[in-house]
Structures are given as C-alpha cells and as structure tokens.
C-alpha cells in the first residue's frame, strides 16, 4: 500500500532515462555530429560516389599538413571520419570532419581559395577552412568548404587509388558527390 512513495522514485528514474538517452538534452536542437542515423560519436567513411574510394590519409600518417587522397575503402583507422556539428549558415549545416586515426581535421592549406588545392589534415581549430557544409542535391551530397565555397572533389573524376583530394568550384561532375 506504499505505492505513493514509489511514484517519486519512478518519476526520477524516468527523468534520468530521458536525460541519458538524449531525449531531454538541452542541445537536442543541434543535429547529430555525424549526419544520418549513426549518432553523435560515430565515425564513418567519406566515400566518393564516382570512384567508390574513401577519403584517406596516406599511410595513416599523423603528420600535420599531409595531403589527403582517395583509397579503396577499408577498415584502416585513417579511412574513418567524424562529422562534428558546428553551426548553420544560410540554411546549410557546417561540420568539422575529424579523422579517427590522427584526430586532425579536413582543411584547406593556408585557407586557400585557389581551385585545385589539395586538401590536408590539420589540428582541428576554428579557422573557416576547417568547416564543411553538407549540400544535398537531386544528384547526391556535396561537401562545400565554408571559406572557399568550393567542393571536395577528385581531379578529373579519377578512379585511381592514391589520387589527391582537392577543392574545386562546385559543379555537377560525378567526383563532387560523396556518400557520407
């Protein structure tokens, strides 16, 4: 007959469940750090829709400033990236892409706006070239650099392993689309 004493305990347990599940989280309005159903701590491939190769760090290097490439997708740690939500601008969500192996971010060297500049990994910061917007189109998903306004691409729509990843003015070329 002590059920009225259990109610506060039940309510406290329910509230704790809501908070730990993220349902009552104050930041619930911000999207997951990785777009899609994978969740906030998920790392996944950034796979080029044209070549089916993944954005990778050559040799799994942890060196600052190393140029990024495409490579056949595998279980290597340097093939996995986390999307960390940063902000929304002009209706587009922007993220930092953090590499699982090096813990460095996808960046454009020196905040260059020159088409064809190879993208690099660099210690994550708040520089404009570290943020990438997700642009959903009827042809697929593009990653657009906040600083340059250019897309992550593979030159000449190459399907060769080891081809560099670059920024290029956004277009409808097949190598501008990524599966994330």
Question: Predicted regions span which residues?
Answer:
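Secretory targeting and sorting signals
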Residues: 1-30
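Short, tandemly repeated low-complexity microdomains enriched for cysteine and small residues
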Residues: 62-83, 112-130, 159-172, 176
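Low-complexity intrinsically disordered segments
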Residues: 14-17, 38, 114, 123
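Extracellular glycan-recognition/adhesion modules and their associated mucin-like linkers
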Residues: 31-62, 80-113, 131-159, 177-180
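Intrinsic disorder/low-complexity signature
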Residues: 1, 22, 29, 45, ...
């Amino acid at each position: 007959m002590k059920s009225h004493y259990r109610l506060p305990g039940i309510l406290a347990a329910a509230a704790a469940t809501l908070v730990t599940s993220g349902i009552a989280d104050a930041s619930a309005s911000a999207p997951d750090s990785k777009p899609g159903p994978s969740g906030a701590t998920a790392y996944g491939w950034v796979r080029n829709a044209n070549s089916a190769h993944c954005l990778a760090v050559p040799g799994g290097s942890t060196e600052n400033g190393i140029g990024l490439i495409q490579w056949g997708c595998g279980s290597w740690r340097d093939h996995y990236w986390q999307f960390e939500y940063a902000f929304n601008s002009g209706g587009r969500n922007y993220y930092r892409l953090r590499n699982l192996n090096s813990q460095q971010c996808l960046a454009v060297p020196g905040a260059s706006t020159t088409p064809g500049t190879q993208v690099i990994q660099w210690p994550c910061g708040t520089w404009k070239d570290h943020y990438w917007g997700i642009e959903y189109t009827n042809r697929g998903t593009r990653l657009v650099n906040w600083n340059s306004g250019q897309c992550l691409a593979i030159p000449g729509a190459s399907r060769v392993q080891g081809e560099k990843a670059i920024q290029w003015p956004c277009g409808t070329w097949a190598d501008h689309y990524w599966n994330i």
